[in-house]
Amino acid sequence: MTCAEPGCAGVVEDGYCVVCGTAPAAATSAGAPAESSVTAATATAGDGRCAEPDCGGTISDGYCDTCGTAPGPPATATVTTAAAPISKATASTRSSVRTGRSSSSKSSARGHLGAGMVDVPRVPRVDPVSAIMADPQVAESKRFCGKCERPVGRSRDGQPGRAEGFCPHCGTRFSFAPKLSRGDLVGGQYEVAGCLAHGGLGWIYLATDRNVGNRWVVLKGLLNSGDVDAMAAAVAERRFLAEVEHPSIVKILNFVEHLGSDGVAVGYIVMEYVGGTSLKQILRDRREPDGGSLPPAQAIAYILEMLPALGYLHSLGLAYCDFKPDNVMQTDEQLKLIDLGAVISMDDESSAIYGTVGYQAPEIAHTGPTVATEVYTVGRTLAVLTMRVPQRDGHFGELPGPDTEPLLATHDSLYRLLLRATDPDPEARFASMEELADQLTGVLREVLAAEDGRPRPGMSAFFGPPRAVFGVGGAVLPADVVAALPVPLIDPGDTGAALLATTAGTSPAELEPAFEAGLRAVVTGRAESMEIPLRLVRAALEVGDPEDAIRRIDLLAETIPGDWRLSWYRAQALLLRRDFPGCYTEFETVYRALPGEPAPKLALAAVAELATAATDGQDRGVGDAGRATGFYDTVWRTDRGFVSAVFGLARLHGMGGRREDAVTALDQVEPASALYTEARIAAVDAILAGRGPTTLNEAVLREAGNRVQRLAIDSKRRGAQVRMRVLEAALSWLEAGGAPGDDAPLLEVGLDREGVRTGLERCYRDLAREAGDMWTRIELVDRANAVRPRTTL
């Protein structure tokens, strides 16, 4: 039976699709459209019958009396798969006040993860029977008392430790032996096949559901029935997870109790069986041959696939708490969170908090679970997947730095993202999974572009496109950089957003009265809008008044302290002042907050280049040509829409004597670009730059000439300028004794003194006719007369 889910080519086995995991829709009458298989599997029939495949039970007290499944929303309801962040004190105001528009929170199409950009290796579906442990035992090194947490069940005097007994320190009973055996029937419905694993809350069993087509299910029992916290966690799990419906989260089917051989009732969570491989095992398989880690793009794709699921839990007021590679399972190309034992309400101030040392946020014991603590676990997990994180006392320690981890030296944006995600200050971390996904997607684009050289442009949720291009055909000027940099997107929810869209003006003097008049016509007051004062800051920068801009920024800082937009605009004001160190520091603040965005990298590159030029390359602090080159290269390699970056890259290559690299970069500008011709002209300049008569040769001259010949230059003045550049170089070479190897023309004139002089005379006279003032015209005519070939009558 083929899967009826749109876009899925899988087949249904054991009641579920082997590709997307969806149950088949209930049969419909001829000619009637089939409902979505997701809603059909969870909806309730109109007469109260359970709609679970192969189940004939009825819904009683909110659950099926046969299979135990809770009914889902009506068939017409839409299951939400992405969530907005919850409103809680963890939202950061220090580095990110708003999220803006997001383009990365949607689930990617199957076959490609990481916003559809990464094709990860498929993991075959594991035969459930093959996953059963032959000899289920808990290693002695992992046996600890559930109450005092001291070692129990250890070997002594050559005798193996006991799997069951009483703690010698506090007297609490412990049991690490499986409580269920093959063939046991739990809850009168689930037949045990064997043990799969031992987790933090006890043994996990494989079983078949005898009431629903013998489908495979997983039973998770408690570590110790006498452990009050563990029992409470199981009960809480059932309560919370009854409402959880997400394609990337394991489905909780039921909660049952079973009377053990000791007469004690033990609770079990019944979950869907996810047959695949955990990320922990995938990482282990990768490390066994050569000690390597997962490719960064693959690891990022895994994380991106799970962020919507975590965000969904947050929208319900729940925290996952124990995100780590062990708890993410890949089957084929689908990922799922498989262990929800640590899930807790963010408002729960009394329940025990479960997690794993090395992944868990350091402040969670004091703050409880928050979005910030969740972000921390994601950052730690990404680090463990991509690099060797040092261990201390058997747990992962501090993250390595670029000086010891080559991956971080290669991908600085990834390093910055990890630093923010795991910042010791919770308020400095990403404010939501959506915001983290936005930045991680940007980092992924950079990583992929660095790996194969193919650009991966993307829509920013924080910035608009570049407004102009700076540094084309001349030196970089601070005012040109400010005029070209992207502008932060306006928050559509701001009270002044509509007014900004309808108000014209350029200077603060023009805009302020218009804003005052507009705000008087609406109910909301000016003090409620942050976008209007930010627009006035930008207006001050656009008219070249950094002092007014800084004054306005200082006033705003009292209302929205730490907002990255203030640093963005303050940096531009300092740039107009030519305060390069201060400017660089402010742009660096934006980069730390938004490591996946190209805009702050472009700004940092421009400032580093300007500082290098201002200090003749002697300042190795801000004025670092190598740093500027790296930023320009990253931006251009990732997104060809930032054309300023390629001109900056070419300038710095030229300054370093790397002519071929400069030309190669400029040749990457596509013919469809408005700057295509300027890039080709700049390439000609790069070929000839710094060459005297002794370092020129015929091949260089002909390459430059052929490039000019192929250009379609609309401007007569611009065409004359670039021809003049080549012919002047040719004349200096000829007059230094250069001799061409053949009589082929150069730019339609002979490559000899008379031909080149004739061509130069024509260039000077063309430029004179296009000159805007008399003195320039006179100078060009004089140069034409001086270079014209001498003739004798």
What are the roles of these predicted feature ranges?
Residues G226-E243:
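AlphaC helix of the eukaryotic protein kinase fold
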Residues A450-L536:
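Regulatory extensions appended to serine/threonine kinase catalytic cores
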Residues M306-L318:
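Protein kinase catalytic-loop region centered on the HRD/HxD motif
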Residues Y205-A207, G213-N224:
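Glycine-rich ATP phosphate-binding loop
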Residues D262-S278, I282:
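Conserved short submotifs of the Hanks-type protein kinase catalytic core
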Residues V192-G200, I204:
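Protein kinase glycine-rich loop
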